């Protein structure tokens, strides 16, 4: 009978979805008793632990739902390697206030300059603010749209894409699109216009986007919507990935020289 209150409490806390309460209350009760704290302080600490853990789980869930190919933060981006990139603007955008204002971001630059890293970093920052985020490459997204159309579930996918607070479309311009694919992707942008924020990364300047969409009319209409409320990140320069590889190679050579001084 002495265990009945604990069993009932565990049952109620599970029903209320308070896992941190359940996990921590006994240990924290003993700790607060040792410190001479009253029941209000005890409950306050317990509630704070639950809130912190709930926020952590929420962020983890947002990150999982975003389907990032990798989790990267802006803290690990080497801004010095891409002098053309406005670091101040990027760090301001990391506050995710542009999402609330339904503004877009376009990162344009030659291949290997870290555009995907910037997109992932902005996406992670938005997840940490509790915002729903989706990530996909342009080619993969078009493939999903075509597949959904063939399987009679296009409307459901379009509603899902329109519902993200932030949608990140990576590598636009790397693969030319079919006419149907281009039209379906245009619909995604059109349905999100002034309803949600979209981040696009591309290796092509705007005047070459027609080569991707195949139609000047469609490209013009797309750019009109996408650039109405937009922050443009210029990211031209030497390959970010190549420079990172060179630095790693130099460090490895230096380490090898230290380990084997006779071979240096």
Where do the language-model regions lie?
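N-terminal pre-Walker A segment at the start of P-loop NTPase domains
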Residues: 72-94
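Conserved hydrophobic/aromatic pocket- or pore-lining residues that grip, position, or stack substrates
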Residues: 77, 119, 137
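Charged, compositionally biased N-terminal leader segments and the immediate start
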Residues: 1-21
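Interdomain "pre-motor" coupling segment immediately N-terminal to P-loop NTPase/helicase cores
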Residues: 19-70
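Conserved post-Walker A coupling segment in P-loop NTPases
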Residues: 102-106, 122-125, 129-145
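Walker A/P-loop nucleotide-binding motif
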Residues: 102-118
């Amino acid at each position: 009978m002495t265990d009945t209150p604990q069993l009932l409490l565990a049952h109620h806390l599970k029903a209320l979805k308070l896992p941190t309460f359940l996990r921590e209350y006994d240990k924290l009760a003993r700790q607060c008793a040792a410190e001479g704290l009253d029941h209000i302080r005890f409950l306050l600490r317990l509630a704070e632990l639950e809130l912190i853990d709930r926020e952590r789980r929420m962020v983890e869930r947002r990150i999982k739902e975003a389907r990032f190919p990798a989790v990267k933060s802006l803290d690990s981006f080497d801004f010095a390697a891409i002098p053309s990139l406005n670091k101040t603007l990027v760090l301001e955008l990391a506050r995710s206030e542009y999402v609330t204002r339904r503004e877009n971001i376009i990162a344009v630059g030659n291949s290997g300059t870290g555009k995907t890293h910037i997109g992932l970093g902005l996406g992670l920052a938005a997840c940490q603010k509790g915002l729903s985020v989706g990530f996909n490459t342009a080619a993969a997204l078009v493939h999903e749209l075509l597949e959904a159309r063939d399987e009679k579930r296009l409307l459901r996918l379009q509603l899902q894409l329109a519902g993200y607070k932030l949608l990140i479309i990576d590598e636009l311009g790397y693969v030319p699109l079919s006419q149907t694919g281009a039209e379906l992707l245009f619909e995604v942008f059109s349905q999100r216009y002034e309803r949600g924020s979209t981040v696009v990364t591309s290796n092509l300047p705007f005047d070459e986007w027609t080569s991707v969409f195949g139609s000047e009319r469609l490209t013009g209409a797309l750019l009109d919507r996408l650039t109405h409320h937009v922050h443009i990140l210029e990211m031209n320069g030497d390959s970010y990935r190549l420079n990172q590889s060179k630095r790693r190679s130099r460090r490895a050579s230096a380490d090898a020289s230290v380990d084997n001084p006779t071979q240096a």
